[in-house]
Amino acid sequence: MEAIKGSEVNVPDAVFAWLLDGRGGIKPLENDDIIDSQHPCWLHLNYTHPDSAQWLASTPLLPNSVRDALAGESSRPRVSRMGEGTLITLRCINGSTDERPDQLVAMRVYMDERFIVSTRQRKVLALDEVVSDLQEGTGPSDCGGWLVDVCDALTDHASEFIEQLHDKIIDLEDNLLDQQIPPRGFLALLRKQLIVMRRYMAPQRDVYARLASERLAWMNDDQRRRMQDIADRLGRGLDEIDACIARTGVMADEIAQVMQESLARRTYTMSLMAMVFLPSTFLTGLFGVNLGGIPGGAWHFGFSMFCILLVVLIGGVTLWLHRSKWL
């Protein structure tokens, strides 16, 4: 493949544009640099920036079929061979930010053995680890190594987030054993996060597996083995997600049962109180009719005797309920 001049990938508002030195390090891309398979270029763009959008729409370095995908049209993880290049769409969890972690960040990549073009709208935190390794001189030396390191970092972030959700489920299960009901909507949000993760991580695992099996010219056998290991690791994470989804279903049933039992206890208590006070209510209502005068109204101890009668009646009903094992 022909070499590319640095001026051809000069985008003023690029997030960064670096030239891999082939030894695990990087240097800023200059206009007079020569980009080839020994010194590939990594161009990272925010496709919402005007200069970046213009470059994506007009550069002859990109096939026409990938322009819309790099500009944000593609969302689900997938991989497509485009002649000598490959278009890859990946998803990342930005779990350490204030954003809702169920909103996965999309990153789109077009690459061949000479250069890498990656685009995003929101920042992809997993790339910070790859950038840090490159700045320290311990990063990838070629395009294949770069892709493996990026996929590894994305999987690390996904695994950490899955582990956090798993810990939340364990805490929730422990609280349920103590009859502690979680706040309303907590379990629903947890289940939604798991389902969204399952929706995007399953095709992403397939992307990794396909990259491991494809005979891409810019990936060697060791890199393919590492990619397969990453796919297997993400597959284990998906198994954990499936188990967590099933556990949230069990917890939802348990929460419903606990709430139903609590409601039944309250209803039972109110029914017992009604049974205890129903006879006394009947007597007070009967005496309160006062059609022919209140019985015993002229007696000095009439009210006291009536109160004693009510106490005895309530006590008798309570004793009967107790012997009947209703109390």
From Swiss-Prot:
It is a multi-pass membrane protein. GO terms for cellular component: plasma membrane. Residues 1-273, 322-327 are cytoplasmic. It is found in: Cell inner membrane. GO terms for molecular function: cobalt ion binding; cobalt ion transmembrane transporter activity; magnesium ion binding; magnesium ion transmembrane transporter activity; zinc ion transmembrane transporter activity. It catalyses: Zn(2+)(out) + H(+)(out) = Zn(2+)(in) + H(+)(in). Keywords: Cell inner membrane, Cell membrane, Ion transport, Membrane, Transmembrane, Transmembrane helix, Transport, Zinc. NCBIfam families: PRK09546.1. Belongs to the CorA metal ion transporter (MIT) (TC 1.A.35) family. This is Zinc transport protein ZntB. It comes from Citrobacter koseri (strain ATCC BAA-895 / CDC 4225-83 / SGSC4696). The gene is zntB.
